C-alpha cells in the first residue's frame, strides 16, 4: 500500500520512542487485562463524568529534530550580554569533564532520591563530599545535602532559628538591610504565614531591637561590602539570639568561616561552583549549623553508617525529621532538593581542590582590586573599602554609564541610588576589566592593567586582616587526588557504577513517575543561550526565555483546565506552599482571613500536611473508607463542623492509593459548598493528561511536578519544578517578585523562590516533551501508563494481593501490593522483598507508603513489555522464595531474602548459607546483573552514631 507524504514524514515518531510498548505489545497486554483497546480500558477505569470529550489542543507532535530546531530559534532571541550584576548569580566555567560525565550523563541525572542506599552509594558519596565542602568553608559541625536555593535557605534558617530558640516569647526576626533583595522577599513571605515580625535595618542596629529570636546577616553584603561581624555575633549570642549568616562559597575560600565567628547557621548558594546561571536555576543551596541543632535542620543529611557485613556505607540520616514521616510536625516540607546541582558543585571542588579553588578566588579578587585601583585613580568613589569580588561605584552620570554598558553588551547592577554594582567572577579576564574601564571612564582613561597589577600586588587592603582565612580547607584526600582529567573521569565513573539509574533498569517507584528523560529533551539545557542568562537581566535580553515560558504555560493551562500558570515554585513542595498561599490570600481579600482549616485525607503524602502547616493552616484529617477512598460522610461532617473556618481540602487524583475515586466531583462540591477551595495535588498528573484535568474535575489550584509527568529528570534527588495552575479568581494571588516584574501576572504577593521563574533553565525539557508528543501523544502516554500498571497488577494479584482497586478491579497508573499477609505467615517483610529485588537487578518500588507493609508500583508508559515481564518474573520468583521459607526449606533468619542484597565479594567468601551462591547473586541469570557495592544498611547504627563528613579513602575500597 502506497503511503502518503504525511505518513512518510512521521511527525509523531517521538511518541513511539517515548512509549515503551509498541502497538502489538500493547494489544498483548490489553488481552491479558481483558480490554479491547486503550480507549476501552480508560473508559472502564476513569469515571464517566470527568472524561474529556476531546484531548486538550496543544498542537500536533513534532519530530525530535524539528522540535530542537524550533526551540533553537526561540533560544536565539536571548541576548548573551556579559553579566556583572551579581546579587548571588555569576557566570561560571563548568569543567567539561563534569559537563560530559555528569550533567549530560543519564547514569547521574535519571536516578532517584537515595531512599534505597544500597543502590545509591555513588551519589551518596558525592553528596557527602558536598557536605564536607560546606563544613570546611562554613566552620560549622553539621551540613545538609542541599536546599532549593539561597533565598529559601534563608527562610528555612529563620524557621529553624525559631524552633531552637530559647526565647520562646520572642516573635521578631531581624534582617540586615544589605542582604540580597530576593532573599528578603522570600523571608518576608515565609514570616507572614508563621506570624513573625520581620525587622529590616542596618546590622549595626540589631542590638537596638527587643524580642528578637533570630538575626540574619550577610557576610559579603549585596553591594559587596565584607563585614566582620564577630563582635556583633558575640553580643547577640550573649542575649541568646540565634544568628544566621548568608555567605558565598567562593568568597569563603579566602574569608574567615562564619562558624568560627560564632554563627549558629550558615547558608548560601553553591551556584558559582560550576553551575550555570540558567536565568535563575536550578542551583543548590548549602546549609550548615551547630551540632546541637542538628535534629532541627531542614532537608536531607547524608550520614556514614555500616552495612550488614560491618563495612562502611552511606545513607540518608535522621529521616524522622522529614515530611514523609513527621507530616505537619516536620522541620520543613522539603521533599526533594538539588542533588544533581550539589553533586556538580561537589565535583567542581574535587576537580580543582584547595589549591585550584584558592587560585580561582585569588584571581577574581586580584582583578577586582585592579578594577578598584584604576577607578579610584580616575577619581571615582567606591562605597565600600572592603570587598571580595563586588564593587559599588558612585557615578555622576549613571545614565551615560549604563548606555555605554549596553552598547558594549554589558550588564551592570543598576538598582543602586547614584551608583552601579560590578561583580566579577571566574570567567572575567584582564580584557574584560579593560572594557569595564572604557564603560565607566570613557575610552581615553589611559589605564594599564599590568601597571595596576603591580601596584595592587604590593599593597592590597581590600580584605580586612581579621577576615582573612587562616585555616586549611579541603584537606581530605578526595579533594587532593583527582586533578587530571583521566583521574577525574575514572573517579566519576566509579561513583556512577555504584548506582542504579534508568539507564540500567526500570525504577518502579509508586508516586514518583520515573519515566524516560529523553536525550532530545535534555540537549537544550546546556545551550549557552539558555545557560548563560542572569535572572535579573533586562527583559528585552530574555525574549527567547519569555516566549518559551509563555508557550509552555499556555500548554499547561490547556492540559490542566486552569486559567493561569505560575512558574516560580522550584519544587513540588514549593508548589504546594505557593498554591496554599494563593488560597490564603484569596480568603483574606474577601475579609475571610480566619479561614485556616485544611482538610487532608489520611492517605495523603507527607508534604501535604507539612505544606499546610507552613502556610499557616491547621490540619484536619479526613478518614478513608475500607476501599481506600475518601469517606464522604466524614468529609461532609468535618466540612460542616469547620464551615466557618474552612480554607481548603488537599486531595490527590488519582488517589494516593492508585485509584480513580468515583466521587471526586462530589468531594469538590462539598468543599465549595462550605466556602473552601480545592487544592488538587498534581503528583499523579501522569494519569490525567489528555483524559481529564484538575480544572475540569472542579479543583481551584494544583501544582505540577514537571520532574514527574513532564519529563524533567529526578537527578538523584533534584532538581524538581512545581509550577502552579490556578483558576482565574486565584490568579492575582500567585507569587510575585521584588526584583523582576513577572509579565502576565497581576500580583503583588511575595516570592517563594529566589528567581522569578524558579529553575528556568530546565523548563526547555518539558517544552520539548509536550512539543514532541502533541495532544494525541500526551493522551496515549497516560493511557499506556494505566495499561502498564494494570498489566502488572493482573499478573501479580494472585501472588501479592492488590490492596485497592476501583471499578472492575482496575487500578490507575500505579498499584499497591499488600505484603502484610505474607509477613504474618512467614516473617518476610516488604523491606526484605525490596532488598531482594536488587539481586534481580531492580530498584525497589515505594515501601510502606501510603500504607505500612506494602509496596507501591508505578511502571510509567516508558517501560516496554519485556522490562515489565522481567520485573513480574522477579516478583514471582521472590514469591516462590518466600514459599520456601514458609515451607521450612530455608530458616527465617538465614535465606536469600533477609540476607539481601548480596555483593560481589560473597562469590569468593566462605559460604555457610543453606542456599547456593548462584541463588544469592544470579537469581535471574547473568544477563541483567547489577552489583550493589554494599550489603543491607544498618539504619539504627547510622542514627545512633551520626557522622556526616568524609571518611578515610580506605573505607571506600
Swiss-Prot record:
Species of provenance: Salmonella agona (strain SL483)
Residues modified to N6-(pyridoxal phosphate)lysine: 708
Domain of life (superkingdom): Bacteria
Coiled-coil residue windows: none
Organism taxonomic ancestry: Bacteria, Pseudomonadati, Pseudomonadota, Gammaproteobacteria, Enterobacterales
Similarity comment text for this entry: Belongs to the GcvP family.
GO-annotated cellular components: cytosol; glycine cleavage complex
Gene name in the database record: gcvP
InterPro entries: GcvP, GDC-P_C, GDC-P_N, GDC_P, PyrdxlP-dep_Trfase, PyrdxlP-dep_Trfase_major, PyrdxlP-dep_Trfase_small
Full protein name: Glycine dehydrogenase (decarboxylating)
Role noted for this protein: The glycine cleavage system catalyzes the degradation of glycine. The P protein binds the alpha-amino group of glycine through its pyridoxal phosphate cofactor; CO(2) is released and the remaining methylamine moiety is then transferred to the lipoamide cofactor of the H protein.
GO molecular function: glycine binding; glycine dehydrogenase (decarboxylating) activity; pyridoxal phosphate binding
Cofactors required: pyridoxal 5'-phosphate
Keyword Protein transport among record annotations: no
This enzyme's EC code(s): 1.4.4.2
Amino acid at each position: 500500500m502506497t503511503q502518503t507524504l504525511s505518513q512518510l514524514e512521521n511527525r509523531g515518531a517521538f511518541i513511539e520512542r517515548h512509549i515503551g510498548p509498541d502497538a502489538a505489545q500493547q494489544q498483548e497486554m490489553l488481552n491479558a487485562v481483558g480490554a479491547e483497546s486503550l480507549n476501552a480500558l480508560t473508559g472502564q477505569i476513569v469515571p464517566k463524568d470527568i472524561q474529556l470529550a476531546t484531548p486538550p489542543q496543544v498542537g500536533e507532535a513534532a519530530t525530535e529534530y524539528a522540535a530542537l530546531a524550533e526551540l533553537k530559534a526561540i533560544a536565539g532571541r536571548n541576548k548573551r550580554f556579559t553579566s556583572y550584576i551579581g546579587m548571588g548569580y555569576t557566570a561560571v566555567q563548568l569543567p567539561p569533564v563534569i559537563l560530559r560525565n555528569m550533567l549530560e550523563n543519564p547514569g547521574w541525572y535519571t536516578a532517584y532520591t537515595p531512599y534505597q542506599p544500597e543502590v545509591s552509594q555513588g551519589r551518596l558519596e558525592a553528596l557527602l563530599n558536598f557536605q564536607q565542602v560546606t563544613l570546611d568553608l562554613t566552620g560549622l559541625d553539621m551540613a545538609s545535602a542541599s536546599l532549593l536555593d539561597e533565598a529559601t535557605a534563608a527562610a528555612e534558617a529563620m524557621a529553624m532559628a525559631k524552633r531552637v530558640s530559647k526565647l520562646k516569647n520572642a516573635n521578631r526576626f531581624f534582617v540586615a538591610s544589605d542582604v540580597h533583595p530576593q532573599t528578603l522577599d522570600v523571608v518576608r513571605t515565609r514570616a507572614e504565614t508563621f506570624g513573625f515580625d520581620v525587622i529590616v535595618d542596618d546590622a549595626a542596629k540589631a542590638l537596638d531591637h527587643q524580642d528578637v529570636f533570630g538575626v540574619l546577616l550577610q557576610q559579603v553584603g549585596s553591594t559587596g561590602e565584607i563585614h566582620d561581624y564577630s563582635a556583633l555575633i558575640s553580643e547577640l549570642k550573649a542575649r541568646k539570639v540565634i544568628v544566621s549568616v548568608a555567605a558565598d562559597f567562593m568568597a569563603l575560600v579566602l574569608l574567615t568561616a562564619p562558624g568560627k565567628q560564632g554563627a549558629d547557621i550558615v547558608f548560601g548558594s553553591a551556584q558559582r561552583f560550576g553551575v550555570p546561571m540558567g536565568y535563575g536555576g536550578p542551583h543548590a543551596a548549602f546549609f550548615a549549623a551547630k551540632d546541637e541543632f542538628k535534629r532541627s535542620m531542614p532537608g536531607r543529611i547524608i550520614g556514614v553508617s555500616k552495612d550488614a557485613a560491618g563495612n562502611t556505607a552511606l545513607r540518608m540520616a535522621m529521616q524522622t525529621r522529614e515530611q514523609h514521616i513527621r507530616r505537619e510536625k516536620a522541620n520543613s516540607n522539603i521533599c526533594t532538593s538539588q542533588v544533581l546541582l550539589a553533586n556538580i558543585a561537589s565535583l567542581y571542588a574535587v576537580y580543582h581542590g584547595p589549591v585550584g579553588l584558592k587560585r580561582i578566588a585569588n584571581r577574581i579578587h586580584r582583578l577586582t582590586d585592579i578594577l578598584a585601583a584604576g577607578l579610584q585613580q580616575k577619581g571615582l568613589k567606591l562605597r565600600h573599602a572592603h570587598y571580595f569580588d563586588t564593587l559599588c561605584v558612585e557615578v555622576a552620570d549613571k545614565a551615560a554609564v549604563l548606555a555605554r554598558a549596553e552598547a558594549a553588551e554589558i550588564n551592570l547592577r543598576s538598582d543602586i541610588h547614584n551608583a552601579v554594582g560590578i561583580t566579577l567572577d571566574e570567567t572575567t579576564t584582564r580584557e574584560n576589566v579593560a572594557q569595564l574601564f572604557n564603560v565607566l571612564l570613557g575610552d581615553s582613561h589611559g589605564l594599564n592593567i599590568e601597571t595596576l597589577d603591580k601596584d595592587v600586588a604590593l599593597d592590597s587592603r581590600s580584605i580586612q586582616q581579621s577576615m582573612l582565612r587562616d585555616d586549611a580547607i579541603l584537606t581530605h584526600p578526595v579533594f587532593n587526588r583527582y586533578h587530571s582529567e583521566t583521574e577525574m573521569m575514572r573517579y566519576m565513573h566509579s561513583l556512577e557504577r555504584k548506582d542504579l539509574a534508568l539507564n540500567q533498569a526500570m525504577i518502579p517507584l509508586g508516586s514518583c513517575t520515573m519515566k524516560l528523560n529523553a536525550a532530545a529533551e535534555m540537549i537544550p539545557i546546556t545551550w549557552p543561550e539558555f545557560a548563560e542568562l542572569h535572572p535579573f537581566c533586562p527583559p528585552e535580553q530574555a525574549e527567547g526565555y519569555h516566549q518559551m515560558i509563555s508557550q509552555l504555560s499556555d500548554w499547561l493551562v490547556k492540559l490542566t483546565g486552569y486559567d493561569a500558570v505560575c512558574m516560580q515554585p522550584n519544587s513540588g513542595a514549593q508548589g504546594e506552599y505557593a498554591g496554599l498561599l494563593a488560597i490564603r490570600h484569596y480568603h483574606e481579600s474577601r475579609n475571610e482571613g480566619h479561614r485556616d482549616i485544611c482538610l487532608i485525607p489520611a492517605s495523603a503524602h507527607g508534604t501535604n500536611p507539612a505544606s499546610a502547616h507552613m502556610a499557616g493552616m491547621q490540619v484536619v484529617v479526613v478518614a478513608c473508607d475500607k476501599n481506600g477512598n475518601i469517606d464522604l460522610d466524614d468529609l461532609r461532617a468535618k466540612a460542616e463542623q469547620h464551615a466557618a473556618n474552612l480554607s481548603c481540602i488537599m486531595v490527590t487524583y488519582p488517589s494516593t492509593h492508585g485509584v480513580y475515586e468515583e466521587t471526586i466531583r462530589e468531594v469538590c462540591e462539598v468543599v465549595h459548598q462550605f466556602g473552601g477551595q480545592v487544592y488538587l495535588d498534581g503528583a499523579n498528573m501522569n494519569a490525567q493528561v489528555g483524559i481529564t484535568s484538575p480544572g475540569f474535575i472542579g479543583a481551584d489550584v494544583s501544582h505540577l511536578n514537571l520532574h514527574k509527568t513532564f519529563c524533567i529528570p529526578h537527578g538523584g534527588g533534584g532538581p524538581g519544578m512545581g509550577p502552579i495552575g490556578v483558576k482565574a479568581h486565584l490568579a492575582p494571588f500567585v507569587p510575585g517578585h521584588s526584583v523582576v516584574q513577572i509579565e502576565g501576572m497581576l500580583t503583588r504577593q511575595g516570592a517563594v523562590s529566589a528567581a522569578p521563574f524558579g529553575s528556568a533553565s530546565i523548563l526547555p525539557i518539558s517544552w520539548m516533551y509536550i512539543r514532541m508528543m502533541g495532544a494525541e501523544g500526551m493522551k496515549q502516554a497516560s493511557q499506556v501508563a494505566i495499561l502498564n500498571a494494570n498489566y502488572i497488577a493482573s499478573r501479580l494479584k494472585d501472588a501479592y494481593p492488590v490492596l485497592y482497586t476501583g471499578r472492575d478491579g482496575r487500578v490507575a497508573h500505579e498499584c499497591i501490593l499488600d505484603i502484610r499477609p505474607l509477613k504474618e505467615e512467614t516473617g518476610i517483610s516488604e523491606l526484605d522483598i525490596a532488598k531482594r529485588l536488587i539481586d534481580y537487578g531492580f530498584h525497589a518500588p515505594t515501601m510502606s507508603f501510603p500504607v505500612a507493609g506494602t509496596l507501591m508500583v508505578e511502571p510509567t508508559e516508558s517501560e516496554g513489555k519485556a522490562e515489565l515481564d522481567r520485573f513480574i518474573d522477579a516478583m514471582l520468583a521472590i514469591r516462590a522464595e518466600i514459599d520456601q521459607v514458609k515451607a521450612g526449606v530455608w530458616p527465617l533468619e538465614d535465606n536469600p531474602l533477609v540476607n539481601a542484597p548480596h555483593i560481589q565479594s560473597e562469590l569468593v567468601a566462605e559460604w555457610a548459607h543453606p542456599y547456593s551462591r548462584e541463588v544469592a547473586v544470579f537469581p535471574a541469570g547473568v544477563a541483567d546483573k547489577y552489583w550493589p557495592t554494599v550489603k543491607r544498611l544498618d539504619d539504627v547504627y547510622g542514627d545512633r552514631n551520626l557522622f556526616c563528613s568524609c571518611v578515610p579513602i580506605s573505607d571506600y575500597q
